[in-house]
């Protein structure tokens, strides 16, 4: 009797389970589309429909079209900072003075501070012109940036000393008044530094190391080399001009020269804004060679140990220009300053700082 009763209970439970399952399933079926539009529901079968639609789509490849980009810059003046970003390294000590823009290898710190030492000594000497004590003010400005200030006339110094004469020629080409007063403050040379291992490899293949052979080695993918931005760096600009000339010495801007340079450029892994970036890349093993001035090279023991210096291009003798139409008083101050730093003791100081070497090298 008990077994019969137990069987009835099990049967009832089974029937109830079937009924509950049916109710739940039916509820889900009836409510699963509640709140959904027909459009939403149809997306559940999107894959199948998309396949049908794609069969009717034709694909045409269109050649990419270059479109002019408006950077919104109307003037170079808008792209360079206010001069306050570059405070004077030597302040004038009198009201009668000239201000000089100078590059960092001679207006920097330590061995790069030759002009700073000279200017301070000049000011301490208290020279007079027409009964007035005179002085100089020195601001450290890179060659390219100094040119931008002068061309844009955002800020005009009285005198400008880039690393080489290429910048002065560009300023003249832009119609600005600039006059070469001294073609050499201190002697210096641009060069290519090549690791000793790579140098030996190139000697075996080419027999000599010069700019022409180096550019050929780069074009052949035999050496990884970097250089600095020619719009900012004097060494970079010198390298650009000199490299173009290796492809066509009669016309560095000819199609032949440009094609040769483009082939060369395709194998350049790095164009850096500063020499420091190049040095860091070389230390990491990315580069076999890079460009640098001799004065910096000779003052860096680790570079002399690992790299060989090969000079190239125009000399970097730090010419000195007057800027604009100077008053007679300012012209006299400038001439007095030139006379001052030309003294043997200041040229000997320049030698101690790494300048006035490789005197026999000519472009």
Task: Give a label for each model feature.
Residues 197-206, 232-233, 245-253, 325-334:
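Short helix-loop capping/hinge motifs at secondary-structure junctions, enriched
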Residues 101-105, 218-250, 261-268:
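Short beta-strand->loop
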Residues 182-191, 231, 261-264, 298-327, 331, 340-363, ...:
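Periplasmic-binding protein-like
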Residues 245-309:
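Ligand-binding pocket segment of bilobal, Venus flytrap-like solute-binding proteins
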Residues 23-39:
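Hydrophobic single-pass membrane-insertion segments
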Residues 3-18:
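N-terminal Sec-pathway targeting helices
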